[in-house]
Amino acid sequence: VIENKEVETAEEAVEYLLVHLGEDLSRPGVANTPRRFVKAMEELTRGLREPPPEVVFFPLEYKADPGPVVIENIRAVSICEHHLLPIVLNVSVAYQPSDAVPGLSKVIKLVKWAAARPIMQERFTEWLADLLLEKLRARSVKVKVCGVHMCSFIRGVKDEHHSMVTESRRGDLDVRLDCRRPLACR
């Protein structure tokens, strides 16, 4: 939980930034911008302050060795740790369950929680694979992350047609994962 004094200090910092950028703080359109910006950043980084969602498991009721479970194109939003600009992600996950399977919504919530923080996509993909292996109690995991980074989409090289794709695997799971580009901007 963020204290009121910390929020006030953050809002003042945004006011200073807006003035630095040349904005007129008396303009009606930006009257509440510092408050809105701080609230938006708190939402985008909630994974830093909130515990991970609890995962509910359902027992497998058959004797056969279960095949892999694949969940493709989970939409999540993160922010670049270098520029604090949004990264729109599509995350695909495959895992080999052990003796029970987690609820589908819990896997999706776990991915969205993990993304809700400043990240570098390459490191995030590795961490997410470790996190899912542990939290899903899986025998093996494969993760594929496709990201559109606003730091190179709207500034710098200004290339709206690229996406970054990263993959990580824990164990011997050999599954092809699809991962669509998160934004189609043609």
In which residue ranges do the predicted regions lie?
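A domain-level signal for the structural core that forms small-molecule/cofactor-binding pockets
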Residues: 1-186
